[in-house]
Amino acid sequence: MNGGHIQLIIGPMFSGKSTELIRRVRRYQIAQYKCVTIKYSNDNRYGTGLWTHDKNNFAALEVTKLCDVLEAITDFSVIGIDEGQFFPDIVEFCERMANEGKIVIVAALDGTFQRRPFNNILNLIPLSEMVVKLTAVCMKCFKEASFSKRLGTETEIEIIGGNDMYQSVCRKCYIDS
């Protein structure tokens, strides 16, 4: 793919979205592209930078709104964004960056723990040149898992946690529990 475009990596928790994002950014680095990654600053589960659930770390700018980094990223040609569902301006930002010739790679949940869409990610799909939906392993029956299930009783959408608060589950296990 030449020129600006958007790559969207979606799926449930524990499906390897952040790992795939890092893999793609590293490939562009090997190909001599100037790359930057951005993560949601309220996600501080493991420390600074972008972290995978298996504790791999990658340097990243940390913000709550993508428009806050517009000046800092002008010299970069590849922009990786983790936890895209939490950025309120993800659609406008990605469209602007791709239109300016930048490669934008977004990793995001496609649905909430209630299996409802993150509308900003849903709105990004028709603007993306590439969309990949990953699956995880069901933490109950070990089959393919397409959903994230919260273990607690909280009802707020934005509660950031790992396997202490969420499980990846298949359709049957989601419904049965």
UniProtKB/Swiss-Prot annotation:
Homotetramer. Two molecules of substrate bind to each enzyme tetramer. Gene3D superfamilies: 3.30.60.20, P-loop containing nucleotide triphosphate hydrolases. InterPro entries: P-loop_NTPase (IPR027417), Thymidine_kinase (IPR001267), Thymidine_kinase_CS (IPR020633). Zn(2+) binds at C138, C141, C170, C173. The active site is at E83. It catalyses: thymidine + ATP = dTMP + ADP + H(+). Keywords: ATP-binding, Disulfide bond, DNA synthesis, Kinase, Metal-binding, Nucleotide-binding, Transferase, Zinc. Phosphorylates thymidine and thymidine analogs, such as azidothymidine (AZT). Part of the salvage pathway for pyrimidine deoxyribonucleotide synthesis. GO terms for molecular function: ATP binding; metal ion binding; thymidine kinase activity. Its EC number is 2.7.1.21. It comes from the Viruses. ATP binds at G11, P12, M13, F14, S15, G16, K17, S18. GO terms for biological process: DNA biosynthetic process; thymidine metabolic process. Substrate binds at F113, I157, E158, I159, I160, G161. This is Thymidine kinase. Belongs to the thymidine kinase family. Pfam families: TK.
